[in-house]
Amino acid sequence: MAEIDARLREEVHLLGELLGQTIRTQLGDDFLDKIERIRKGAKAGRRGSAAGAEQLTSTLGDLGDDELLPVARAFNQFLNLANIAEQQHRVRRRRPDEPEPFELRVLDELLERLLAAGQKPDELARQLGRLDIELVLTAHPTEVARRTLIQKYDAIAAQLTALDHSDLLPAERERIAQRLQRLIAEAWHTEEIRRSRPSPVDEAKWGFAVIEHSLWQAVPQFLRRADRSLQAATGLRLPLEAAPIRFASWMGGDRDGNPNVTARVTREVLLLARWMAADLYLRDVDQLAAELSMQQASAELRAQVGDSAEPYRALLKQLRERLRETRSWAQQALTADIAPGAAVLQDNHDLLAPLQLCYQSLHACGMGVIADGPLLDCLRRAATFGLFLVRLDVRQDSTRHAAALSEITDYLGLGRYAEWDEEQRLAFLQRELDSRRPLLPSDYRPSADTAEVLATCREVAAAPAAALGSYVISMAGAASDVLAVQLLLKEAGLRRPMRVVPLFETLADLDNAGPVIDRLLGLPGYRVRLHGPQEVMIGYSDSAKDAGTTAAAWAQYRAQEELVRLCGEHQVELLLFHGRGGTVGRGGGPAHAAILSQPPGSVAGRFRTTEQGEMIRFKFGLPDIAEQNLNLYLAAVLEATLLPPPAPEPSWRAMMDRLADVGVKAYRGVVREHPQFVAYFRQATPEQELGRLPLGSRPAKRREGGVESLRAIPWIFAWTQTRLMLPAWLGWEQALGQALAGGEGELLKNMREQWPFFRTRIDMLEMVLAKADASIAALYDQRLVEPALQPLGAQLRDLLSQACAAVLELTGQSRLLAHSPETLESISVRNTYLDPLHLLQAELLARCRLRQQAPESPLEQALLVSVAGIAAGLRNTG
């Protein structure tokens, strides 16, 4: 196995040493020796030493209740420190003889390929400037790290960057080491787990913090690099107002199954976003006013400021006053219903115009080098983030809209909307949408649930259009689901177009997505209300939970193909919104490969996707890493637009049909039909305990019931904690196994080599199987599962083994990830620290279940820390 980079090893070792010193100072040599025995036992056990495994098990088993929490914290902290070192390694300064990382050279190489393929330079520049990519930041119940700790981790990363300079004096190196020691001690002495669930507003503030501390710096850096790449390839530059990647958010807008997200919360989050945006621009404008002291200005700028000796400062002073007014109003409006004054900025144009005027004037007066400095960065931010920072989506379940309309139609004496068939619903909705009179009489008094739905619609109607993204309808299944929301918004006073987006998330709904959109686009009057592309959201999480990833992936692909075809027939542009999670079981995986594996024609210059809580931190938490990931998105969407993959061969489609059919039967045969499955799941995993932990503002369940009532995130998170990773692979072992046994290996190998969709699926499957660990899953069974259910656990581990064997046969390797030794080494290094946490977690679960601990007890706290540590060690968790 290739050794991980020596510098990375040195840094991991350094951070581990400093953590050890911190632990020794607080808890003494004996305790640190115990930690070291556990670590060495885990390492020896991984190398096949029975004595090492025995040492690990006995040392952990002998721990007293008072020792469980500090042991869990030690391994949790180490995994977080290893993550920091690994992230930092990805962006560290290269030596002159080292190539740039793929993430930074990907756009340059793509532009060369596109020009070689015959793209005209001006068309290429135009297409790059027109790209419309939106990353939608979502809250995440398994993002367990507190914001306080994330800030400390970022500071540790900054010190590692400083340590990277080869010309440091010994005294400077010593100062950095002392600062690192202090930061690690601060992290160790900070409680890593919050005592109470975050509110939706807390979650939104967490999202704003990522923008403030990372994306605010990363976006202009990323656009500078894209501009340089374009100029080097074509001689042309990105337009000043180009914003190929923008950001939206679900934090404070996603009320699906979360009663804590109310209309009041949505209003508060919208105001906080405006406050934060104004505050960030004020910092920029203060810096610009200090720098732009020049006297020479264009006639256009002079017309705005007269004969001021410092015309740029005079113009920026006007903007600064308006930004202060905006921030002050947003602050006051949080506690009182105050109308914005005339000076409050309401339109992005009012923010951009003075900045553009300064920029154009500087260029006109021969000071382009000054214009292209911080002023250009501020302009890029203004084009990307605007006055509202992120566009807030609203999401609600279709049943809530139907219930509200049922109550209204019942009150009006029209019968119950929920009991009508689709034709009756559509006739009623179209009639009311065309009517000029209000639907609701003034004396109508709605129930609490209906009042909340209507209040949300009123907030949407009252908010500026640029503050909002889409209104997403979860569990959509019919054209009437979309019209229902349009009617409720009309009733709330909305007089402008709003994107109302059906989310298709079960297998049946994905198969029905084409007919629903076909019906919708054919309805009289619908196209008039559309204004722009038809947006459709594809759900990855619930379809995989419903049918397994084999059938779900193929259903998602086919649904997209059908939507592309139908929108083409109707001559309507299509925007696909991908509801991906962080894990393979929820559609996660490397974004670049995922985008390039979409059906031909489905990207077409537009791409919208969710970015999940814990993945936001890993992909966008540090400016340099954020820049790399933004580069990947830009290059992938440009490539998928201009060099789309070929349509799959008929034989490949037929094979995928067979794989999906076998896969869904195998998956449901276990998850839905095995009589012991639910009982086994609840005993073998921390599923029940996860519901009690303060991990997010949203409940883990939609309602009482079995697996089907669980949300997709805790369903996957529970299996990840035990390393069985079942949702990501179950079904593939039968599907691939049968095809290979039937002599279809050559066809499968051709599909993997020539079809990006299939290659990406197999690559992600291989990655998750490499992280899965049957021996760890067996330990949970031995400690937690009653004997009558243990044979099912053994059967599932056998299926895991079959899945691994099938992937190895298909890829022609002797071990998983043999082609990626760095990834294998990374998993191997983490296992040394993960193994004790898994054993400890199984022990904690056993003790907690035996004694029914209170949430604040040391045992419950230790359990929560073990959950956080395993999540940190495995990265993409739920």
From Swiss-Prot:
GO CC, sorted alphabetically, is: cytosol
Cofactor(s) for this UniProt protein: Mg(2+)
Q: Does Lipid metabolism count among this protein's keywords?
A: no
- Which is a GO BP term held by this UniProt record? tricarboxylic acid cycle
SUPFAM superfamilies documented for this protein: Phosphoenolpyruvate/pyruvate domain
Which reactions appear under catalytic activity for this entry?
A: oxaloacetate + phosphate = phosphoenolpyruvate + hydrogencarbonate
Q: Name one molecular function that GO assigns to this entry.
A: magnesium ion binding
Pfam assignment, any one: PEPcase
Q: What is this protein called?
A: Phosphoenolpyruvate carboxylase
| Organism from which the protein derives | Ectopseudomonas mendocina (strain ymp)
Gene behind this chain?
A: ppc
